[in-house]
């Protein structure tokens, strides 16, 4: 599967929805917990530009109740 910025953005938005959050709630939580900007447009632009840093992805996952795990392909 070719990964594009649209699939990345949509994948992250889908995870937000599956965790029963709105984008605004995520932005508020990230602002309170980690000092992110409280601007929804900044967060949305970050997703569109694919400029989310790995540290920010970890913080986003934490707020959503997930963890990011690295595993080799083919492992269960």
Regions found by a protein language model. Give the residues of each.
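Alpha-helical residues within the helix-turn-helix
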Residues: 28, 32, 62
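DNA major-groove recognition helix of helix-turn-helix/homeodomain DNA-binding modules
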Residues: 54-69
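A short, Lys/Arg-rich alpha-helix, primarily the initiator
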Residues: 1-25, 29, 67
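Recognition helix of helix-turn-helix/homeodomain-like DNA-binding domains
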Residues: 33-52
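Short amphipathic recognition helices of helix-turn-helix/homeodomain-type DNA-binding modules
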Residues: 71-76
């Amino acid at each position: 599967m070719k990964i594009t910025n649209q699939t990345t953005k949509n994948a992250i938005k889908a995870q937000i929805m599956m965790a029963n959050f709105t984008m605004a709630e995520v932005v508020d939580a990230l602002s309170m917990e980690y000092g992110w900007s409280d601007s929804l447009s900044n967060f949305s632009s970050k997703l569109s530009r694919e400029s989310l840093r790995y540290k920010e992805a970890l913080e986003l996952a934490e707020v959503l109740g997930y963890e990011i795990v690295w595993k080799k392909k083919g492992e269960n």
